Amino acid sequence: MKIDELEVKNNLKLIGLISLALVFFASNSILARMAISTQNIDAFSFTFLRILSATFILTSVYIYKNKNLKIDLKTNYLSGFMFFLYAICFSYSYINMLAGIGTLILFAVVQLSMIIVALFSNEKLSVKKVIGITMAFGGLLYLLYPRNDFSISYFHTFLMFLSGIGWAIFSVLGKKSQNATLNATDSLFKALFFALVFGIFYILFF
């Protein structure tokens, strides 16, 4: 009985955390769309501020807990680039995409990408994963199927696809880390580096 109660509590905790993550994930899209649609800030500046503020917050949290921070200049560049890819494509896609549509596409692509990565890693697909990938793929097909009463920019949809792939790979790489907070902080510093490089090209050529 105690084991069953513990399992129920763990499942409820997991459901609660997943629900909370989904709420923040969806709110992220709503706030991004609200910011970019006003045209008071461009997509790159919005992305740069997001990465900079995230880096500052995570660095502060890590230093508060561990009193010091050591950034490894030789690792986490792929993880950092994937986070940057997620963030920059996410912002530019919302120039011409509704928040709800973008969220649905992002959720589906992230799920599909993570399952594909799992398959390449020789992980076995459970029934739940098969149901999940079927729902995600079916939802994408329904959403993107041409209809007279609904139109969508396929270029901005492509950007959201890239954003979802970037987030999925970033998450998979982070899963392998022994210290999630340190790994995420280090990756964000690398993402900030890629944002600065992109910013130089943005200022010079756009």
Question: Which residues fall in each region the model found?
Answer:
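Glycine-/small-residue-enriched transmembrane alpha-helix faces in small-molecule transporters
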Residues: 1-45, 81, 85-89, 149-176, ...
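Structural motif at transmembrane-helix junctions in multi-pass transporters
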Residues: 38-45, 88-106, 181-182
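Hydrophobic alpha-helical transmembrane segments in multi-pass integral membrane proteins
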Residues: 87-95, 140-153, 192-206
